[in-house]
Amino acid sequence: MYAVFQSGGKQHRVEAGHTVRLEKLEVATGETIEFDQVLLVADGETVHVGAPLVEGGKVVAEVISHGRADKVTIVKFRRRKHHDKKMGHRQWFTEVKITAINA
């Protein structure tokens, strides 16, 4: 059984037991969170596709940790001017473990 749900403006395909990194959520570590914006639920032969959401669909997850991703380096360069500018960015994330999928 798998589901597709939306969180932080992105869609994630998950199964029970999977660990997923989402955009940062303001939830304490160890707490349980429910995602109700479920777009699709597939259970063996049957597939429930929402229009746009599946009625009664929920994905239940447990918050494992919060952190920051690896640094992405941005370089801006002006040709012929001997000028360059370097910047870095580290995005915050929340890591969750999917415990249940309800349709």
UniProtKB/Swiss-Prot annotation:
Q: List the residue ranges forming a coiled coil, or say none.
A: none
| Any one Gene Ontology BP term | translation
Provide this UniProt record's keywords sorted from A to Z. Answer: Ribonucleoprotein, Ribosomal protein, RNA-binding, rRNA-binding
This entry carries the following GO cellular component terms, namely: cytoplasm; ribonucleoprotein complex; ribosome
The reply to whether RNA-binding figures as a keyword in the UniProt entry is yes
GO function term, MF aspect, one: structural constituent of ribosome
The disulfide bonds in this chain are none
Report the family membership.
Belongs to the bacterial ribosomal protein bL21 family.
User: Subunit arrangement?
Assistant: Part of the 50S ribosomal subunit. Contacts protein L20.
Sum up the protein's function in the record's words. Answer: This protein binds to 23S rRNA in the presence of protein L20.
Its recorded name reads Large ribosomal subunit protein bL21
Organism, by scientific name, is: Shewanella pealeana (strain ATCC 700345 / ANG-SQ1)
Organism taxonomic ancestry: Bacteria, Pseudomonadati, Pseudomonadota, Gammaproteobacteria, Alteromonadales
